Amino acid sequence: MYQPTISHFFKSSQPSSQTDTRQDEDQRLDIESHEQRGGANMNKDELINILGSDSESDQDLDEDLDQDQNNNQDQDQEQDRDLASKANNGRSTLSAERIERRPDFNEKLKTIMRKRNAGSMINTGSDDENDDNDDVKSTKRTKANNKKLTELDQQFKELKLKHMDTILCVRVGYKYKFFAKDAEIVSNILQIKLVPGKKTLDESDPNDRNYRKFQYCSIPDTRLHVHLQRLVFFNYKVAVVEQTETSALKKNNNSGSLFTREIKNIFTKVSYGINETFDKSEDRILGDLTSVWAISINETSKMRKVNLISVQLNSGEIVHDQFSDDILLNVNLEARIRYLNPTEIITEEELPPSIRTIFTKLNQDIQFYQSHKEACPNLFDALQGLDLNNELKRLLSVLHSYLSTFENTKVLYFASNYSSFTAKNFMVLPRNTIESLEIFENSTTNKTNGSLLWVMDHTRTQFGYRLLRKWISKPLIDLKSILDRQDAITCIMKEVHSIFFESFNELLRKSIDLERALNRIAYGSTSRKEVYFFLKQIATFASLFKSHHTFIHDQLHKENSALRKTSCLLFNILQNLDAFFSATDLPLFLQMINVDAALDKDSHKNVIEFFNLNKYDFPEGLLHKYRDIEEVKTELDDELQNIKRVLKRPTLSYKDTKDYLIEVRNTQAKTVPSNWVKVNSTKAVSRFRTPKTEELVGKLLYHNDLLNLLAEDEFKRFLQRIVDRYAEIKTCINNLATYDCILSLAATSSNVNYVKPKLTELHQKVKVKNGRNPIIESLDVNYVPNDVLMSSNSGKINIITGPNMGGKSSYIRQVALLVIMTQIGCYIPADSAEMSICDRIFTRIGSHDDLLNAKSTFQVEMSEVLHILNSSTPRSLLLLDEVGRGTGTHDGLSISFAILNYFVYLADNCPLVLFITHYSALCQIDSKLIANYHMSYIEKHQPGEKWTNVIFLYKLVLGQAHNSYGFNVAKLSNIPTEIINRAFEVSEEKILSSKHHNFLEIMKALKRVNERKLNKEALKKIQAFIEDI
């Protein structure tokens, strides 16, 4: 049976700024006495007598009970309907039947009592929402009565008119409420009750005139972030509206009856991960690898010019880029979408549908927003060293305006966060290559398992994982950088048993996400607990380096040290880290924190006692306010002496040091002066305050609230002192991330039969002995190793034929994966390897159409081939799998032949090409650049089967295959033998027909084209042919 939460029954309205966890013994005894009577017949007034007068209004109680019954309608819908009716008509008792249906009710009463005694930071003062006299089922009203909204609804309306694209989540006491259309949306997503009322702000709905208030639904404040995640997952922007004053401050300022409220946080899918509450145990965070783009696009008839700035809020990485793109292919734009994974696109003007389609085709969750350019001179002063053109600066202003809504602009002010998407020392893999080679996700389930990232990811930290992902997506093309990583891996593998490195590695494994924490500190969205863990982590690293000072000094300063001789990269990392940890004063900041308070679950203690005032270097303001509080407490002690004299009870004391109540037995209540204020009572005792005590308690609450505000200001100042060191801390984290990535590559390289490839820049070459596909091998499949031999001297073009399912596609993917791993700096699965450096890797594998852009499968194939031909260089690696499969045999053969001829024509400028085909006639092309291979097999005949069966050997051997053995694949697919036999007979008849005998004539014609040396004019004809499709 569903059990409602504590907040669904009673909520304290006592405006408290302290927490006292001691239990009220008399309240406990009264509840236990009720339990002994069977737990029934306790009405709401009796509960108020037990718990005191701080329980929420009758209406809120009935409303919560009614909402509970809606959430549990499967089991007790009928009983709840009766109860709601009683509540609305009589509203006098908490029915015994509901208590009986909740066997844990009495236990909950005890929990409520403990919560009441613990106090609360939430003020439920005198807002009309807490003194709501409307029934749960909103009754219809006359026109005269509904012209004026309630104060709370009017406050919501004013906020909503300023944020029409945002769902407002408004704190009302111990709940968060959603109003009007927002409530309708939230109710549907969260499946919670919607209380009827006005649906629109302007009463455009005909039924709105029947209500005075907006329709609404609500959630408990303890479940806020659970529900926020669900809302932003559905791509809604949600703003959390908080009360900005407490009851004590409100009373002292003589403000109106309504609490002031303002937006504290705004969340979207991309910003939630950086703004939500800190949780160091969470592995992968919502929005962790997504980004926000500011983009401008200018189009001509054939080309599209794009400027963009992308910011990843968790890492603080900002990427700027400008490029041109073919308006039909969108290859460059799609590559950037695949790399940077945008979920929010910001523009000044609305993007046309054709552009939106490019984004949503790759990610349906992308949201589009418009923002305006704003002046931000301080930003460009901070970025003076960056080479940004005027258009990128304009986009940066637009992005700044948008992020200011979330208070996430701080990351834009650090020049070290900026980088260009393209650079001279790494290659950019096209989207097709990333997907075809399963770099980040497998193509079956779209999960990380079974991808290259999965094989290579042994990182210990979140920031290390993000950097490794970047390394894999952008392999190096600079020889020295690759060799530096190889040397670092070799050094780590040799030094892995060093005490220092073992301790360092283990410390990394336990590290929080320092990069994310630093940016949350910069944004001001962090928590005190997170700041403590952040500083503690930095201090722990510093302590490790200090304790191993001798080892580090020897490695860094001795000429013959293993580190200095073996790895320049690792040497620089260690040197930079040692310098930072030796000089930083962040461990001193850690000493300024009161650890117990920082980790305390009591939010009030967490705030006002966060600093260790014996160590904190700016304690004056806090100490002054503590003295004010102590003076009031002294006055309360003096007043207690007067009370003792009046009651003639020398041993009397306050009931507690939170509410400062005087407890008198009911039998002696008549002796209490008439001007004393009765606060609450039980069957045994009554509790009072004197007029002076009442005044002093209000004064105490006021000073406590001021202390709270002052502590918040001091915390902000403390955060700013950390942010002032942002650049050097970020550099330190980058060094830690680089080291973590090297550790990960070293772990991968330590696999059995992995070898360090030899690199050369002199000529094109990929030579691998017994190479293996790293992904398939990691899946515990017995993978057959294969050699690779491609060089400028011979075999720059490998034509591969063989049976269907014989392993041709797996083989060419293996070659590309080994090249990528090599240029990341990692060892590879092979006996030996020697490679030149490739500047681009292109793939044309598989087939698919593009219905959104009205492109057939064949047109998509030809467009991609054309892009590859235009974009490849002599240093590129091309993987072409069955080009021409999307059209008829004659056209497919002709196109394949023309493409191969084009590569032959390029001669020394020809890239390395792996060309899979079932057109065996192509193997007749005579050129020293071409080498023919096939995947080996053994033929076998089975009784009753007219066709030839094959046993796959998955071994690449020289020569061509003369049959694709498609009937064998049909058998493996469990097609009935009778059908396959008939298909074989038809095939044999066609082979003997004159139409297929004309293949020899076709080849003679193609050979004549070859003799005329197909040139770039022929390529233009191919392009014209594609455009006419």
Curated annotation (Swiss-Prot):
Q: Which UniProt keywords apply?
A: ATP-binding, DNA damage, DNA repair, DNA-binding, Nucleotide-binding, Nucleus
Q: Which Pfam families match?
A: MutS_I (PF01624), MutS_III (PF05192), MutS_IV (PF05190), MutS_V (PF00488)
A single GO BP: mitotic recombination
What Gene3D superfamilies does the record point to? Answer: 1.10.1420.10, DNA repair protein MutS, domain I (3.40.1170.10), MutS, connector domain (3.30.420.110), P-loop containing nucleotide triphosphate hydrolases (3.40.50.300)
| GO molecular function, a single term | ATP binding
Matches recorded under SUPFAM superfamilies: DNA repair protein MutS, domain I, DNA repair protein MutS, domain III, P-loop containing nucleoside triphosphate hydrolases
Q: Which stretches of sequence are listed as region Disordered?
A: 1-142
Q: Which GO terms describe its cellular component?
A: nucleus
Stretches of Basic and acidic residues bias are at: 21-47, 97-110
Q: Which domain of life is it from?
A: Eukaryota
Give start-end positions of Polar residues composition bias.
1-20, 86-95
Biased region (Acidic residues) positions are 55-67
Q: Where is it located?
A: Nucleus
Q: Where is this region: Mispair-binding domain?
A: 143-270
Q: What does this protein do?
A: Component of the post-replicative DNA mismatch repair system (MMR). Heterodimerizes with MSH2 to form MutS beta, which binds to DNA mismatches thereby initiating DNA repair. MSH3 provides substrate-binding and substrate specificity to the complex. When bound, the MutS beta heterodimer bends the DNA helix and shields approximately 20 base pairs. Acts mainly to repair insertion-deletion loops (IDLs) from 2 to 13 nucleotides in size, but can also repair base-base and single insertion-deletion mismatches that occur during replication.
Similarity comment text for this entry? Belongs to the DNA mismatch repair MutS family. MSH3 subfamily.
NCBIfam families assigned? PRK05399.1 (NF003810)
Q: State whether it acts alone or in a complex, and with which partners, per the record.
A: Heterodimer consisting of MSH2-MSH3 (MutS beta). Forms a ternary complex with MutL alpha (MLH1-PMS1).
Protein name according to UniProt: DNA mismatch repair protein MSH3
Question: Per UniProt, what is the name of the gene that codes for the protein in this document?
Answer: MSH3
